[in-house]
């Protein structure tokens, strides 16, 4: 069992029960899934770029990404409906906890001028979205093999009803929010 899952079962559940006065353990919010999305706009001209992005995303998450396709045609971007333009991975279960642990303990501290993640990136339903400017912060990525610096979106979906509950859940896991 991963370190964060164990922490959730022992400490986090108790702390949240006390803080929000839940009557049942089943009311305690938990992390449902983590979606890692990488939009690759350059894939329109060169499909090789998408292969590199997929490979990097697989290294980072340990799971094969799903290639996302364009929903609409946009003439200004030379984009046709159904063209591959990105990749995403949905993590659940143990892999999700492992990824979150790695993100909090290793990757985020490697960001340049890092002062914590924004407290305002909640969507009103307790889900948290985090944008990362470069994939180099992950230890699996070899600096010499990177052809282009790419960013990604990480969405942490929780079962929390409010942003306050979601924020407290992530804070208990050790998410470094700004002061």
Curated annotation (Swiss-Prot):
Keywords: Ribonucleoprotein, Ribosomal protein, RNA-binding, rRNA-binding, tRNA-binding. One of its GO terms (biological process) is translation. The gene is rplE. This is Large ribosomal subunit protein uL5. SUPFAM superfamilies: RL5-like. It comes from the Bacteria. InterPro entries: Ribosomal_uL5 (IPR002132), Ribosomal_uL5_bac-type (IPR020930), Ribosomal_uL5_C (IPR031309), Ribosomal_uL5_CS (IPR020929), Ribosomal_uL5_dom_sf (IPR022803), Ribosomal_uL5_N (IPR031310). This is one of the proteins that bind and probably mediate the attachment of the 5S RNA into the large ribosomal subunit, where it forms part of the central protuberance. In the 70S ribosome it contacts protein S13 of the 30S subunit (bridge B1b), connecting the 2 subunits; this bridge is implicated in subunit movement. Contacts the P site tRNA; the 5S rRNA and some of its associated proteins might help stabilize positioning of ribosome-bound tRNAs. Belongs to the universal ribosomal protein uL5 family. Part of the 50S ribosomal subunit; part of the 5S rRNA/L5/L18/L25 subcomplex. Contacts the 5S rRNA and the P site tRNA. Forms a bridge to the 30S subunit in the 70S ribosome. GO terms for cellular component: ribonucleoprotein complex; ribosome.
């Amino acid at each position: 069992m991963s370190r964060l899952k164990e922490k959730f079962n022992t400490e986090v559940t108790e702390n949240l029960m006390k803080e929000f006065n839940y009557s049942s353990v089943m009311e305690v919010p938990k992390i449902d899934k983590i979606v890692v999305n990488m939009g690759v706009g350059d894939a329109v001209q060169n499909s090789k770029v998408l292969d590199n992005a997929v490979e990097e995303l697989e290294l980072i998450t340990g799971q094969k990404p799903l290639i996302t396709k364009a929903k609409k045609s946009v003439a200004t971007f030379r984009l046709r409906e159904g063209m591959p333009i990105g990749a995403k991975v949905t993590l659940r279960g143990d892999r999700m906890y492992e990824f979150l642990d790695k993100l909090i303990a290793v990757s985020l501290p490697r960001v340049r001028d890092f002062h914590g993640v924004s407290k305002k990136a909640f969507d009103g339903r307790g889900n948290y979205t985090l944008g990362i400017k470069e994939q180099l912060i992950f230890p699996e990525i070899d600096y010499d093999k990177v052809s282009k610096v790419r960013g990604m979106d990480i969405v942490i979906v929780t079962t929390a009803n409010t942003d306050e509950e979601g924020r407290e859940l992530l804070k208990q896991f050790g998410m470094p929010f700004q002061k």
